[in-house]
Amino acid sequence: MLVLGIESSCDETGVALYDTERGLRSHCLHTQMAMHAEYGGVVPELASRDHIRRLVPLTEGCLAQAGASYGDIDAVAFTQGPGLGGALLAGSSYANALALALDKPVIPVHHLEGHLLSPLLAEEKPDFPFVALLVSGGHTQIMAVRGIGDYELLGESVDDAAGEAFDKTAKLLGLPYPGGAKLSELAESGRPEAFVFPRPMIHSDDLQMSFSGLKTAVLTAVEKVREANGSETIPEQTRNNICRAFQDAVVEVLEAKVKKALLQTGFRTVVVAGGVGANRKLRETFGNMTVQIPTPKGKPKHPSEKVSVFFPPMAYCTDNGAMIAFAGAMHLGKGREVGAFNVRPRWSLSEIVK
């Protein structure tokens, strides 16, 4: 079956075609990054209008790439939430109108479930079960995934998401939009331990996380640098050092929490998904991940166990239609109820987990 996927939750318009027998047939994406850059962030009204302009051309582009026509589409999947209300409505209205015209089922998809399943689009796919780290600008959550639709929330950020902390810290440092990616780039030139920031909740027994205090620590460091220099300008190397220290702190917390999740579940496979999954430092750190089962005092230590870690292809780390088409196809195959028109801007992932 050929499923058309539509993503419009924020500032990317994504359309893709997924074939349940042949895999991903085509994938088209338009980013609004340049349009929002002059405002320093996403402007919801502009985002909605641009989605409306892009959806038809992107759909036709995907059909052309796949050598298919509208008549070949068997179902239409769309992002129902969470996201910007107007942006979601643009995609939902288009998906439902197209499905009605084609007399095909429409499949509402949770945006985060799309990210959760995106590594399954890679040539080398993880096997169930696995621990999933969803890490993006809006969410940071750790899940136990035992199969399609079988998810358990293990822990999440109690305040800022990791990606949000990246963006806000970048803004504190005066970096251009989108700041998170620029911060990661500058961190490559930072000196290790020139600054040392706290690792919030890293030693807590649970799998909850917090990043707002880390952002505050950066603000304090920036203010001290400016006061010492008698200038609002932060020296280039100092700025890079702050970026490095911030990134190291975030990645260390994420690594520690995921290791705890592996010990808690007994799983030895990790999937990382979401926009921050493109971060080079995160990929390097998780790529070398091992876990060691705790032993009673005085007993020989267990050998470290290697962990299999999977990331989605870079093209599917950010918002995209391919993950929505895939998630929709999986639910269509399992007989999920379809036909919901409404959008859900504040849809918690906890509502679809066990």
UniProtKB/Swiss-Prot annotation:
<protein>
    <recommendedName>
        <fullName>tRNA N6-adenosine threonylcarbamoyltransferase</fullName>
        <ecNumber>2.3.1.234</ecNumber>
    </recommendedName>
</protein>
<dbReference type="GO" id="GO:0061711">
    <property type="term" value="F:N(6)-L-threonylcarbamoyladenine synthase activity"/>
</dbReference>
<dbReference type="InterPro" id="IPR000905">
    <property type="entry name" value="Gcp-like_dom"/>
</dbReference>
<dbReference type="GO" id="GO:0005506">
    <property type="term" value="F:iron ion binding"/>
</dbReference>
<feature type="binding site">
    <location>
        <begin position="134"/>
        <end position="138"/>
    </location>
    <ligand>
        <name>substrate</name>
    </ligand>
</feature>
<dbReference type="GO" id="GO:0002949">
    <property type="term" value="P:tRNA threonylcarbamoyladenosine modification"/>
</dbReference>
<keyword id="KW-0408">Iron</keyword>
<feature type="binding site">
    <location>
        <position position="319"/>
    </location>
    <ligand>
        <name>Fe cation</name>
    </ligand>
</feature>
<feature type="binding site">
    <location>
        <position position="115"/>
    </location>
    <ligand>
        <name>Fe cation</name>
    </ligand>
</feature>
<keyword id="KW-0012">Acyltransferase</keyword>
<keyword id="KW-0819">tRNA processing</keyword>
<keyword id="KW-0963">Cytoplasm</keyword>
<dbReference type="GO" id="GO:0005737">
    <property type="term" value="C:cytoplasm"/>
</dbReference>
<dbReference type="InterPro" id="IPR043129">
    <property type="entry name" value="ATPase_NBD"/>
</dbReference>
<feature type="binding site">
    <location>
        <position position="111"/>
    </location>
    <ligand>
        <name>Fe cation</name>
    </ligand>
</feature>
<feature type="binding site">
    <location>
        <position position="180"/>
    </location>
    <ligand>
        <name>substrate</name>
    </ligand>
</feature>
<comment type="similarity">
    <text>Belongs to the KAE1 / TsaD family.</text>
</comment>
<feature type="binding site">
    <location>
        <position position="279"/>
    </location>
    <ligand>
        <name>substrate</name>
    </ligand>
</feature>
<keyword id="KW-0808">Transferase</keyword>
<dbReference type="InterPro" id="IPR022450">
    <property type="entry name" value="TsaD"/>
</dbReference>
<keyword id="KW-0479">Metal-binding</keyword>
<comment type="function">
    <text>Required for the formation of a threonylcarbamoyl group on adenosine at position 37 (t(6)A37) in tRNAs that read codons beginning with adenine. Is involved in the transfer of the threonylcarbamoyl moiety of threonylcarbamoyl-AMP (TC-AMP) to the N6 group of A37, together with TsaE and TsaB. TsaD likely plays a direct catalytic role in this reaction.</text>
</comment>
<dbReference type="InterPro" id="IPR017861">
    <property type="entry name" value="KAE1/TsaD"/>
</dbReference>
<dbReference type="Pfam" id="PF00814">
    <property type="entry name" value="TsaD"/>
</dbReference>
<feature type="binding site">
    <location>
        <position position="167"/>
    </location>
    <ligand>
        <name>substrate</name>
    </ligand>
</feature>
